[in-house]
């Protein structure tokens, strides 16, 4: 049988506090030996080492993302397909556990530039793995398909977004968001606008990834 570990996805602070969810939301996407990334829209480029004459110190995992220049690629024309991912799904009590193989299609659907300045956008394997340089903001759309088909599938999972500080914000929408969680000393403000949930850091402090700057979601999508 499949020996892959059932990996819970949560944010753990130095006090070992974490997001706790029922079993049906407890697992996240994982790579398999067959996982590969294909550019389905746009022209990719190498991860940049400089921007506007300044050296960039990208983290090693960011360099592995798929990078695009906004000067050569526009919104709705940047897309990657991540083939052969897998996620463990089960009922709330842990019964009926099984692995689901999926393809994930990630599309940049909006780009807001800063003073018409071009920059870079990068996408990774996970639904929150994204980086931008030199632009104001962007919107990423994630769609799951049954592996090797064009049949959309709905999955239950959870995600935690960390290090939202220094006037940053994040907006999240899904087919169904079943829970949202922050720490009891959160520094974030909240706004719901239509089907999007926004969390905003209304301060100039860099908290370096503390739990108070994190928000967790359980969702179906």
Predicted regions and their residues:
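N-terminal targeting leaders for non-cytosolic proteins
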Residues: 1-130
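Contiguous ligand/interfacial binding patches
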Residues: 6-9, 13, 17-21, 25-29, ...
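A general structural signal for short secondary-structure junctions and capping/turn motifs
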Residues: 71, 150-152, 217
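Extended extracellular/luminal ectodomain segments enriched in beta-structured repeat modules
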Residues: 75-77, 148-158
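A mature extracytoplasmic/lumenal domain signature
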Residues: 84, 144, 163-165
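Extended, low-complexity, turn-rich repeat/linker tracts enriched in Gly/Pro/Ser/Thr and Asp/Glu
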Residues: 90, 132, 149-150, 162-173
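Short beta-strands within extracellular/lumenal beta-sheet-rich domains
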Residues: 132-149, 211-215
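Residues within well-ordered beta-strands of beta-sheet-rich folds
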Residues: 141-143, 156-162
């Amino acid at each position: 049988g499949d020996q892959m570990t059932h990996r819970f996805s949560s944010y753990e602070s130095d006090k070992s506090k974490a997001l706790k969810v029922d079993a049906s939301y407890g697992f996240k996407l994982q790579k398999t030996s067959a996982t590969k990334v294909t550019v389905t829209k746009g022209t990719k480029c190498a991860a940049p080492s400089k921007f506007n004459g300044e050296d960039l110190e990208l983290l090693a995992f960011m360099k592995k993302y798929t990078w695009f220049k906004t000067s050569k690629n526009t919104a709705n024309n940047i897309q990657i397909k991540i083939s052969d991912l897998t996620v463990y799904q089960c009922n709330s009590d842990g019964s009926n556990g099984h692995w689901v193989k999926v393809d994930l299609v990630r599309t940049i659907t909006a780009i807001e530039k800063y003073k018409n300045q071009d920059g870079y956008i990068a996408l990774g394997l996970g639904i929150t793995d994204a980086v931008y340089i030199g632009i104001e903001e962007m919107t990423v759309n994630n769609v799951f398909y049954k592996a090797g088909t064009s049949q959309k599938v709905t999955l239950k999972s959870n995600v935690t977004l960390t290090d939202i500080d220094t006037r940053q914000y994040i907006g999240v929408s899904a087919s169904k968001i079943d829970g949202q969680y922050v720490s009891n000393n959160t520094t974030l403000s909240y706004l719901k606008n239509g089907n999007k949930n926004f969390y905003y850091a209304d301060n100039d402090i860099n908290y370096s990834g503390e739990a108070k700057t994190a928000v967790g979601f359980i969702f179906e999508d």
